[in-house]
Amino acid sequence: MRRTLYRLMIELTNGRFTSYILRKFAQSRLSSIIIPSYAKVFQINQDEMEKGLKEYRTLHELFTRKLKEGKRSIDTDASSIVSPVDGVFADHGPIEDTKTFDIKGKRYSIVDMLGNEERAQRYAGGTYMVIYLSPSHYHRIHSPLSGSVTERFVLGRKSYPVNAAGMEYGKEPLSKNYRSVTEVNSDGEHMALVKVGAMFVNSIELLHERDTVQKGEEMAYFTFGSTVVLLFEKDMIEVVQELKSGQELRLGEKIATRLAHK
């Protein structure tokens, strides 16, 4: 009963109309009134921000803020995969040959996540990684590796929350939420960067439109905290052993190593 009620409450508060109203408020000058308290509550690191707090005219501008030059460095090892965001490392593990994986007691379908069987088949037997962004984090998304962009597409119409409660009670939020997917071919192997929308605000803005992308290059931004899921082909990477669930990650930090193939 509790699970059903929670899901119903989520459904009633994250449709397009609600998201539209919240987005309009966040983009209005009226929202500037709550910027100081927002920054305090979420403990935003103001020393890293490109501009002073008072220079942000709306909550939207604060959500999508840039960082000062040099505040993040991208790992330069040619074999490294880097974190595409500032966030909290949630989980990683194998993708089953059935094109599914388990996280937080839920089974996720790669077919559902990517929209069809053909896309999902590439990642059977591969590896997934999940990174959660809170409202306090830097919200811009960068590429974890270099390669050629093979496809960009959007799926889903609503968004369950992706915090602990949402992951427990939501209806498979990582594969059902509004999400924007970019697939990259890197030296003949594929990676999917799945950008998952958060509760209320469905907006994921794409910034990168070229056919190629470089490791660390800016690709998109969230207009609120959310989650990214990385999918890699079989035998493509080895996750850094020291990574632990709940660990804070910074953009550009090494999270995996490309495996050499003879």
From Swiss-Prot:
The modification Pyruvic acid (Ser) is found at residue 226. Its cofactor is pyruvate. This is Phosphatidylserine decarboxylase proenzyme. It comes from Bacillus cereus (strain AH187). The active site is at residues 86, 142, 226. Pfam families: PS_Dcarbxylase. Is synthesized initially as an inactive proenzyme. Formation of the active enzyme involves a self-maturation process in which the active site pyruvoyl group is generated from an internal serine residue via an autocatalytic post-translational modification. Two non-identical subunits are generated from the proenzyme in this reaction, and the pyruvate is formed at the N-terminus of the alpha chain, which is derived from the carboxyl end of the proenzyme. Signal peptide: none annotated. InterPro entries: PS_Dcarbxylase (IPR003817), PSD-B (IPR033177), PSD_type1_pro (IPR033178). Pathway: Phospholipid metabolism; phosphatidylethanolamine biosynthesis; phosphatidylethanolamine from CDP-diacylglycerol: step 2/2. One of its GO terms (biological process) is phosphatidylethanolamine biosynthetic process. Heterodimer of a large membrane-associated beta subunit and a small pyruvoyl-containing alpha subunit. It is a peripheral membrane protein. The record marks 225-226 as: Cleavage (non-hydrolytic). Coiled coil: none annotated. Its EC number is 4.1.1.65. Keywords: Cell membrane, Decarboxylase, Lipid biosynthesis, Lipid metabolism, Lyase, Membrane, Phospholipid biosynthesis, Phospholipid metabolism, Pyruvate, Zymogen. It is found in: Cell membrane. GO terms for molecular function: phosphatidylserine decarboxylase activity. Belongs to the phosphatidylserine decarboxylase family. PSD-B subfamily. Prokaryotic type I sub-subfamily. Binds 1 pyruvoyl group covalently per subunit. Catalyzes the formation of phosphatidylethanolamine (PtdEtn) from phosphatidylserine (PtdSer). One of its GO terms (cellular component) is plasma membrane.
